[in-house]
Regions:
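Surface-exposed recognition segments
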Residues: 479-484, 519-522, 576-577, 582-584, ...
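Post-nucleotide-binding-loop coupling segment downstream of the phosphate-binding loop, primarily
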Residues: 106-178
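Conserved Walker B catalytic segment
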Residues: 188-210
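Conserved P-loop NTPase "ATPase switch" module shared by AAA+ and STAND
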Residues: 175-194
Length: 705
């Protein structure tokens, strides 16, 4: 549904000038400030101007520092997160992602209101400080704003064709220093998004005015699948911290009530925070919170939830599961029931009173848009009606198709389940990873399911690399030159990087220190082990050598070790590098693929479970050779970060020495989640001090004689 008061392109027959568009949007942006946002327990309403909570991103100062490799240090200091306004200050084009209720639209409207009123950009006082990155707060002086919400490809096409050229090219009035364009719900234009965004960026970047800004807002599941140029920075919206929630509640409520209002886990979502505030409820679980709120607003007959269900059925064009509403029947929606997040919870509540057949048909009709609803329904039934839950679960899983795979992921989050259902869900999750058909976000969920239930994949399996004459290097970076040939011996290499679970076993057995926050997380045991130094990786290899010799996995004349740089490069490139190859080489070929690795282009900004990108496997069968994490090699680099002392061509000059000065850096290969395609490839050479560690570097093992 369109945002009711938001103008769209071509609302008028004649084309508007830039001045007319800006004036119309200034009036609209000013009106945003008076839109109702929060309802207090006593019924008072706070508008956007007074009720807004400034939002943060998940991007930290550590992340920014780690764009270049550096030596990591353990610290007890909490992370410092960049606000959304910090990101807008630093990036001309931005894609912000957040789930329903995360505050995307509210942020955009408050920003436009602040620009229209020329007031200071909003920062959260509950956060200790603005990140100290040598830059001032974002100055809104002289800017103008335009907010657009899109329903489909036609909306975005009209925007690109009729409005943005005028805004970016002709906004030259002396009082206009730059235009901030917000495009909300870009996932609704997913089919032709790639071509549209290229046109928008051409218009934006061709303007000499560098104060222009483009803000794209999207659901995270959709944004992970959008092909976005590197000139668009991608970030995620951080849920509200307990400090942010307390800071909003404290001035408005008696001191004794503060502890009990919006303190629960679910209220980190801004929409649920608003619900808990009005209901004067902790909000530990969304479904319990919704029921308490419905009591607060006197919905004794369930009409609010029923109406939400009818609306949703019409939205997904599934009239077969509902009775048509009598003509002229309108429900006076409470303010918070207009939120998409709250509507989905309401629909789930109504479905809990209907048959399982209706629920299955409802989900199968549109499994993407109804996923959040089914999730809430399953949680309700798990708590209240075990028999109905089991019947619904079996009905959802009876067809061995993608929809059943999606249902399995939702069932896994519903709470405690029986062993039989756990096995069925694990089977579906494994198929999701093997097939790689579902979007990346759902493959992540599948990996979390397997981590929690016990990943059945052999994550220590090795690929055999035959002896051959291999080509190393590339012409894409001076440190990878010259390209040259080198003979290598037969060896075996891990198909996957060493995982959290594998390294945790080593830590437990040896007592070695490991500061990774992932080590005890049941949902991340199949993630690559990170925050490990080169010395840690070497120690793991020695420990695994002893174990594998003892159980016969390897012979007494074989050892487990880190790969040398040539071995790593051959495992990644699979013999397809040639002396005349121009450009980058990736494990899958010479053309970049956005769906083949967890690199900067993916926008995740953190490692993911191993093996989630089957399309990116090398021809030797090795997964995650590029992106996700940097991988330690045995090879020495030198003392300087920019230029190696041990350059190419590779020589037997002591660079493979196991003992060396701690100031001599060791080679890292493959790039990580924050590396772009020019680094996340088969030939780019990185490095780090052997005592350094970070959440973006790990390792895989080699077995050789």
């Amino acid at each position: 549904m369109r945002h009711s008061d938001v103008p769209f392109l071509n609302d008028t027959v004649t084309m508007e000038s830039a001045t007319e568009i800006l004036e119309r949007h200034r009036a609209l942006s000013t009106s945003f400030g008076s839109e109702p946002l929060l309802v207090l327990p006593d019924g008072r309403v706070l508008d956007l101007a007074t009720g807004y909570i400034p939002l943060l991103s998940t991007f930290t100062t550590e992340d920014k520092a780690a764009k270049g490799l550096r030596k990591g240090k353990e610290s007890s200091a909490p992370p410092v997160y960049f606000s959304l306004n910090d990101l807008l200050r630093d990036n001309q084009a931005l894609l912000l992602s957040g789930p329903s209720g995360s505050g995307k639209t509210t942020f955009a409207k408050h920003l436009c209101y602040s620009i229209a009123e020329q007031i200071r950009a909003a920062y959260s006082p509950a956060v200790d400080k603005v990140p100290d990155v040598g830059a001032a707060e974002w100055d809104l002086k002289g800017l103008r704003s335009c907010y657009f919400a899109v329903d489909d490809d036609q909306d975005l096409e009209a925007l690109v064709r009729d409005t943005l050229p005028s805004l970016f090219a002709n906004s030259s009035a002396s009082e206009v220093d730059g235009v901030v364009v917000v495009i909300d719900a870009v996932e609704n234009a997913e089919q032709r998004f790639s071509s549209h965004i290229e046109n928008i960026l051409t218009q934006l970047l061709s303007s000499p005015n560098k104060r222009h800004r483009l803000i794209l807002l999207s659901d995270p599941t959709a944004s992970n699948e959008l092909v976005v140029p590197l000139t668009v920075a991608r970030y995620n919206i951080k849920p509200l911290s307990s400090a942010q929630r307390r800071d909003k509640v404290a001035p408005l409520m008696p001191a004794e009530a503060i502890v009990d209002i919006a303190s629960g886990d679910s209220t980190s979502n801004p929409a649920l925070f608003a619900l808990a505030f009005e209901a004067k409820h902790p909000g530990d679980q969304a479904e319990v919170l919704l029921d308490a709120w419905l009591v607060k607003v006197n919905d004794a007959d369930g009409s609010i939830a029923e109406n939400a269900f009818h609306q949703m059925c019409m939205e997904i064009s599934n009239a077969s599961v509902v009775e048509p509403q009598p003509p002229g029947v309108e429900l006076d929606w409470p303010l918070l029931a207009r939120s998409r997040k709250i509507k989905r919870l309401l629909v789930a509540r109504h479905l809990s009173n209907l048959s399982t057949e209706v629920a299955v048909e409802f989900f199968r009709h549109d499994p993407i848009r109804t996923a959040e609803i089914l999730q809430s329904l399953l949680i309700r039934l798990r708590e209240a009606d075990d028999q109905k839950f089991d019947i619904l679960a079996q009905a959802l899983l009876e067809d061995d198709d993608i929809t059943s795979q999606r249902a399995a992921l939702l069932l896994a989050k519903a709470g405690k389940i029986c062993a039989q259902l756990e096995d069925q869900i694990s089977h579906q999750a494994l198929e999701i990873l093997r097939e790689g058909r579902l979007p990346f976000a759902e493959r992540q969920d599948a990996a979390s399911v397997l981590s929690r239930f016990g990943d059945p994949r052999d994550l220590l399996v090795l690929a055999e690399i035959p002896a051959s004459l291999v080509t190393l290097g590339s012409n894409t970076h001076v440190n990878s030159q010259p390209m040259h040939e080198l003979p290598i011996h037969t060896f075996r290499i891990g198909i996957y990087p060493i995982t959290v679970g594998q390294y945790a076993t080593f830590k437990t057995a040896t007592g070695r220190q490991w500061v990774s926050p992932d080590r005890d997380d049941p949902y991340r045991q199949n993630f690559p082990a990170t925050d490990v130094t080169w010395h840690d990786a070497v120690a793991y290899c020695g420990w695994l050598t002893s174990r594998w010799r003892a159980n016969g996995t390897i012979g007494e004349d074989e050892q487990v070790r880190l790969p040398s740089e040539p071995e790593w490069e051959e495992a990644a490139s699979s013999g397809r590098n040639t002396l005349d190859l121009a450009g980058c080489l990736y494990p899958w070929g010479t053309e970049w693929r956005s769906d083949a690795s967890n690199s900067e282009e993916t926008g995740l900004n953190q490692p993911c479970a191993v093996g989630l990108f089957p399309k990116g496997a090398s021809f030797h069968g090795c997964h995650d050779m590029t992106g996700n994490i940097w991988e330690w090699c045995t090879t020495l680099w030198g003392e300087g970060m920019a230029t190696p002392s041990f350059g190419y061509p590779w020589q037997d000059d002591g660079r493979e020495a196991t003992e060396a000065s701690p100031s001599l850096r060791r080679v890292l290969r493959g790039g990580c989640f924050s590396s772009g395609r020019l680094k996340a490839n088969c030939t780019y050479r990185g490095s780090l001090e052997p005592g350094g560690y970070w959440r973006g570097n790990g390792f895989r093992v080699v077995v050789s004689r």
